[in-house]
Amino acid sequence: MGNELLSTARIYTFKIPDAYNNVIDFDQFKNKVILIVNVASLCGFTPQYKELQLLYEKYHERGLEILGFPCNQFGNQEPLQEEEIVESCRRNFGVSFPIMKKTKVNIDCDGHESELYKYLKSEKPGEVGFKGVRWNFEKFIVNRKGEVVARFNSLITPLQLEGFIEQLLSE
């Protein structure tokens, strides 16, 4: 029982820099639904930013937080610097949700990997038990209790998650 409580509360222990190096303390997300997405500017899935923003505008006041984590591990599709990424997202998709510092969502050849993503993947392994993030715009959802309750691949669009998000916000 104690390990279960530790596991569910662990999401709130993370402190991660945003694109401007401001530290975001995940403790502020207690009692909120969090959608965590690894993003890239030059990916075929990049238009998903628009749907993410629509969800953010519609549900932020009810407790939805969306965090975009730029990642350059898939086909070098995020070559921009952090501030350029934010500017591109705002200009092209009207993004107002937080964009974080570039992140290693999977372990690289030097052994570097985001502790947050290591945690998310351990809580919700991917398809057929594959733990690694397969591509840009893979999504993790954390409920109001801090539990990682779902993981969706890149083919699932943000708007396809709307009903699930509404359900979690109602809990």
Swiss-Prot record:
EC number: 1.11.1.24
UniProt GO molecular function: glutathione peroxidase activity; phospholipid-hydroperoxide glutathione peroxidase activity; thioredoxin-dependent peroxiredoxin activity
CDD domains registered for this protein in UniProt: GSH_Peroxidase
PROSITE patterns assigned to the protein according to its UniProt record, in alphabetical order: GLUTATHIONE_PEROXID_1 (PS00460), GLUTATHIONE_PEROXID_2 (PS00763), GLUTATHIONE_PEROXID_3 (PS51355)
Catalyzed reactions per annotation: a hydroperoxide + [thioredoxin]-dithiol = an alcohol + [thioredoxin]-disulfide + H2O
GO BP terms in the entry: cellular response to oxidative stress; lipid oxidation; peroxisome organization; positive regulation of transcription by RNA polymerase II
Recorded GO CC terms: cytoplasm; peroxisomal matrix
SUPFAM superfamilies: Thioredoxin-like
Disulfide bonds: 43-89
Top-level enzyme category: oxidoreductase
Keyword entries, A-Z: Antioxidant, Disulfide bond, Oxidoreductase, Peroxidase, Redox-active center
Effect of loss of the gene: Sensitive to hydrogen peroxide. Unable to filament and thus, escape from murine macrophages after phagocytosis. Also displays defective virulence in the Galleria mellonella infection model.
Positions of the catalytic residues: 43 (cysteine sulfenic acid (-soh) intermediate)
Oxidoreductase found in the keyword field: yes
UniProt key word NAD: no
A Pfam family: GSHPx
Function: Involved in oxidative stress response and redox homeostasis. Functions as a sensor and transducer of hydroperoxide stress. In response to hydroperoxide stress it oxidizes (activates) the transcription activator CAP1, which is involved in transcription activation of genes of the oxidative stress response pathway. May also play a direct role in hydroperoxide scavenging. The enzyme is not required for the glutaredoxin-mediated antioxidant function. In the presence of peroxides, GPX3 is directly oxidized at Cys-43 to form a cysteine sulfenic acid (-SOH).
Misc: The active site is a conserved redox-active cysteine residue, the peroxidatic cysteine (C(P)), which makes the nucleophilic attack on the peroxide substrate. The peroxide oxidizes the C(P)-SH to cysteine sulfenic acid (C(P)-SOH), which then reacts with another cysteine residue, the resolving cysteine (C(R)), to form a disulfide bridge. The disulfide is subsequently reduced by an appropriate electron donor to complete the catalytic cycle. In this atypical 2-Cys peroxiredoxin, C(R) is present in the same subunit to form an intramolecular disulfide.
PANTHER family: GLUTATHIONE PEROXIDASE (PTHR11592:SF78)
Family in the record: Belongs to the glutathione peroxidase family.
Quaternary structure (record): Interacts with CAP1 and probably YBP1.
Protein name according to UniProt: Glutathione peroxidase-like peroxiredoxin GPX3
Gene that encodes the chain: GPX3
